């Protein structure tokens, strides 16, 4: 592993928190992700399923976790099933976890090889009152490709069609949204690596560089800092491309007088960071660019004061929309008449700020969490307002990651990353 693994006490605690939400006599099942093939004998790098990782710390394919707190056999209240390693596998693929290593990573004492799964699982299902199965219930999930979890659910329903099924996803969304101090440490590390990348870019950008040159510089810094790379596909969008919210081609030349909108973040230990900065290609903002930049920064700073415990996310987004509306009027992008005649379902400000301000972040960049419950301590959110003006070939977004406190304003995990335009200009022209 490139990263420092967290102590198993975290995963023991996470399983305890999960178990507290289960019905009496319930059995829960979690599967690892597949290794996804591309063509011929090629495949994408393995990325572990966030839920089994959150509950076990095991970062290995072909793994299954069972949680059965009320089992009559105390050795079967937590079970990990792993692919059995061998000298041949070690030569071709590298060493896999043995049972002792699996315990050291997860705190799970009972570890079996995968070929024993069906026999043991059958005995546990018979004893259980219901079975919690795991599905991807993220509001923006792409569910076209069948996953290992999907195949398991199909198999389970065929074999155990008379058994009661429950959903693990609502529980996972709840417990994953509240971060442990150890998780926050990993997220801070990811943000610190992202800072290194950002400072490298401020010293690198000049007219004539390609967007992909910037992407390459970032990847260099991330890999050198023990990150596995980008937490998500980076956006390096110069000029008018900055008005395409998910522009990922990164293949244009950065021209004198343009602003580059960059949205990127390092991954560390499975945890994401998510940063947006907008910088002038030539190191100097024009007055108009400054005005738009400062409007976005004002909204971001004021939004951070609103992101507090007890508030509902929907209410928070309405309040931020009002902040943005005021700034767009000041910039003469919308008028009071536009506001008076606006469609309530799509306010006038959305012509220039059409996305949300904040999302959960953690093991996933767009992490799971419940919008139906109030903001709570140790949740982590982005704050990322933006203004996009295609007719001016200008798009500016500013984004940092924030940890909710017990009271008062959140803590900015990216507070050391330059954001004031004067500092950005100074660093680009030193």
What are these regions (language model features)?
Residues 1-430:
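Active-site neighborhoods and metal-handling regions in enzymes and metal-associated proteins
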């Amino acid at each position: 592993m490139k990263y420092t693994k967290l102590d198993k006490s975290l995963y023991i605690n996470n399983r305890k928190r999960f178990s507290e939400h289960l019905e009496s006599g319930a059995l829960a099942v979690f599967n690892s992700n597949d290794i996804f093939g591309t063509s011929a004998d090629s495949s994408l790098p393995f990325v572990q399923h966030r839920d089994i990782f959150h509950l076990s710390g095991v970062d290995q394919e072909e793994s299954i976790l069972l949680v059965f707190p009320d089992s009559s056999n105390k050795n079967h209240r937590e079970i990990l099933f792993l692919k059995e390693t061998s000298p041949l596998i070690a030569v071709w693929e590298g060493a896999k976890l043995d049972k002792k290593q699996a315990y050291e990573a997860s705190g799970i004492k009972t570890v079996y090889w995968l070929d024993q799964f069906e026999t043991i699982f059958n005995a546990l299902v018979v004893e259980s009152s219901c079975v919690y199965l795991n599905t991807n219930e993220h509001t923006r999930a792409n569910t076209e490709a069948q996953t290992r979890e999907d195949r398991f659910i199909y198999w389970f329903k065929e074999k155990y069609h008379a058994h009661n099924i429950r959903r693990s996803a609502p529980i996972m969304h709840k417990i994953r949204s509240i971060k442990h101090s150890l998780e926050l440490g990993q997220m801070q590390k990811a943000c610190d690596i992202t800072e290194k990348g950002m400072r490298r870019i401020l010293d690198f950008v000049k007219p004539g560089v390609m967007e992909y040159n910037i992407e390459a510089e970032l990847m260099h810094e991330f890999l050198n800092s023990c990150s596995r790379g980008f937490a998500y596909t980076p956006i390096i969008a110069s000029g008018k491309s900055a008005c395409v919210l998910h522009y990922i081609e990164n293949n244009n030349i950065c021209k004198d007088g343009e602003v580059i909108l960059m949205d990127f973040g390092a991954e560390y230990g499975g945890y994401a960071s998510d940063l947006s900065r907008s910088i002038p290609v030539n190191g100097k903002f024009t007055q108009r660019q400054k005005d738009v930049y400062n409007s976005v920064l004002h909204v971001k700073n004021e939004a951070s004061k609103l992101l507090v415990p007890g508030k509902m996310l929907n209410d928070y987004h309405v309040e931020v929309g009002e902040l943005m509306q005021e700034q767009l009027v000041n910039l003469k992008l919308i008028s009071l008449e536009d506001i008076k005649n606006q469609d309530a379902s799509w306010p006038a400000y959305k012509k220039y700020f059409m996305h949300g301000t904040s999302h959960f972040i953690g093991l996933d960049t767009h992490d799971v969490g419940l919008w139906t419950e109030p903001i709570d301590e140790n949740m982590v959110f982005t704050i990322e307002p933006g203004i996009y003006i295609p007719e001016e070939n200008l798009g500016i977004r500013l984004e940092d990651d924030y940890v909710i406190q017990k009271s008062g304003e959140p803590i900015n995990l990216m507070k050391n990353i330059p954001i004031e335009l004067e500092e950005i200009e100074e660093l680009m022209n030193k």
